[in-house]
Amino acid sequence: MLGRPKLVLASGSPRRLALLNQAGIEPDALRPADVDETPTKGELPRSCANRLARAKAEAALQSIQLDDDLRGAYLLAADTVVAVGRRILPKAELVDEASQCLRLLSGRNHRVYTAVCLVTPKGSFRQRLIETKVRFKRLSEEDIDGYVGSGEWRGKAGGYAVQGIAGSFVVKIVGSYTNIVGLPLYETVSLLGGEGFPIRFGWLNAS
């Protein structure tokens, strides 16, 4: 993509890629970062999201510095954490984890935190943390069993995907919807634009 600086997304998430594409921004490369996402003992949700986004950015930066085509590109990383109070919910991989998450979320408010970390071509780190409050309806055992059976939850923070079936569980959202999906679009695009990335480059003939 000639005519603009390159952009690397440090994620393999189809949702984050789709959100960037929705904003008319197409990364030149994906460099998913292999980072241990286990919270440290006593770690608070905000701190966890910030730490992991930075760790993903640093890991991906090492990778692109070895690539002549991508060295000096903008690098974007993000991490999403779902929490009830101070309790961080897992990125569910097991049926039991998903069931436990859903029971905990049932009929309650929870918060979704996404930390976005941008590395500029000059190597500066810029970071934003976005918080969204979400309320679920009271889930029946049939709701929980049916949703777990869908498999949609697998690998998702908090054991659900708001852009899928679980969207029907949501009573109220206060804040950014795209933040819950995994990348707060307004803040991400503002961050990129504020650091000199030509965010409107891909808008021409985007329809």
Swiss-Prot record:
Q: Which GO terms describe its cellular component?
A: cytoplasm
Where is this protein found? Cytoplasm
Q: Where are the catalytic residues?
A: D79
Among InterPro entries, the record links this protein to: ITPase-like_fam, Maf-like
* Family, per entry: Belongs to the Maf family. YhdE subfamily.
**Protein name listed in UniProt:** dTTP/UTP pyrophosphatase
Q: What does this protein do?
A: Nucleoside triphosphate pyrophosphatase that hydrolyzes dTTP and UTP. May have a dual role in cell division arrest and in preventing the incorporation of modified nucleotides into cellular nucleic acids.
Q: Which reaction does it catalyse?
A: dTTP + H2O = dTMP + diphosphate + H(+); UTP + H2O = UMP + diphosphate + H(+)
GO biological process terms on file? nucleotide metabolic process
Q: Which cofactor does it need?
A: a divalent metal cation
* PANTHER family (alphabetical): BIFUNCTIONAL DTTP/UTP PYROPHOSPHATASE/METHYLTRANSFERASE PROTEIN-RELATED, BIFUNCTIONAL DTTP_UTP PYROPHOSPHATASE_METHYLTRANSFERASE PROTEIN-RELATED
HAMAP family recorded for this chain? Maf
Q: Write down the Gene3D superfamilies for this protein, in alphabetical order.
A: 3.90.950.10
